[in-house]
Amino acid sequence: MSTNRRRMRVASVVAGIGIVAVLAAGCARGGGSPDATDGGGAPASPGITDESITLGITTPLSGPTAGPGTCTVAGITAYFGARNAEGGVEFGDGQTRTVEIDALDDEYDPQKAKANYDQLKSSVFAMTAGLGTPTNRAWREAAIADEVPQVLIMTGDPIFSDTAESPWQLGFVPIYQNEGGAFGELLAGSAEDHKVAILSQNDDYGEGYVEGFKAAIEGADNIEVVKELTYEATDTSVDAQLTELAGSGADVFFNAMSITPLVISSLQKTQELGWLPSWFLPSNTSSPSAILEPGGAAAFPGVYTVAFAQSAAAPTFAESEDGAAFLEQMAEYANYPDVPAFPHCVWSYQIGATLEQVFGEMTEPTRENFMAALRDVSGYTAPLMLEGSAVDTTQDGQPAVSTVQVQKYNGKGYAPAESWDE
């Protein structure tokens, strides 16, 4: 997709990426229907009527992050496309509404993300599902000032889950510190000594992963960080950093990287250098088919990541009732016939399911009532979650999902890693 002004709308009939994509130029902006109330006279917020609710998304739909970005729209589009086809979603105020999605491409550019938010804020009820830390940060303060929900977004930046700092926000995926910490705990439990080299993105994303990892290995006599470097999110190559890290003698490479092409080229470059450590990769840049296979990850003794959701690429995924329904709905309502290579499709689908839970508790068609209902979800097992994971929005400082499982690449997909030495 080549434009950042692309809109995707979920209707009560077939809708999806590539099927319904309307250029969002000069669209009239309006609030909720004047006669949409809670029955007791409370005026509706923008983006909701007695018949429908509209959600906004700004996310990368083109550029190097388009793969996972497109998934952030596809999953929720599929989920609500199916619900709309069944007649809509029942809300706590007694109304049944269809759910529409307006999605704009920000190309992973913070300025474009802010412009997209400004374009959407008056016509959508809430913003959701968008990918990226710098892009979501670009309009966080504006959303607070405008009192527009920015919720269940795909960033592990803890600021979005701090109620005092971000009263109109809530992240969906585990914070970066939780992911880095989970791997650190696994490594610290090893019976062997390890030298670690770190490469991280020079922003809150990279810093969060490193912070969690270092906290987990603090006091572990068997772990030594021997070299630590950073890169910029705008860099097109990290060959220089990899060459320097390869000379460190590290047997473990902690790579907190968010850019898909850079991860692939890093896997390839380290092999060219003859440096074959075990790797850690974040959950959003560890896809077996889209990243590990083209990068030649099977050459390394181990590639580890973390997860809270089932992988659509797993051999047994389509055999389960939820997995089969997901794939069918992705094809029918999101124009996504292939098995998703990125986990963001499943995450976005789970966001849709979580929002349906929240809608069912809304007693007024207002953003304030929505936020109150959102912060009261506990113990909800969304479709396609791994055993032991659940949605809990009641913990201040934590996103909707805070538990992760460390996994190890087996050449085709991932299997749980109970210990480093197994």
What are the language-model segments listed below?
Residues 53, 75-100, 218-222:
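Signal peptide-proximal N-terminal region
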Residues 33-43, 67-74, 89-163, 172, ...:
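Beta-alpha junction/loop-to-helix N-cap segments that form part of ligand/metal-binding clefts
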Residues 111, 124-227, 280-304:
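Extracytoplasmic ligand/sensor domains, especially the bilobed periplasmic-binding protein
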Residues 1-54, 420-422:
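Short, low-complexity disordered leader/linker segments with a strong preference
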Residues 40-50, 56-79, 104-110, 132, ...:
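Extracytoplasmic "Venus flytrap"
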Residues 332-345, 354-413:
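Segments of small-molecule ligand-sensing domains
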Residues 36-57, 91-98, 188-194:
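Immediate post-signal peptide segment of exported/extracytoplasmic ligand-binding proteins
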Residues 270-349, 417:
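Extracellular/periplasmic periplasmic-binding protein-like sensory domains
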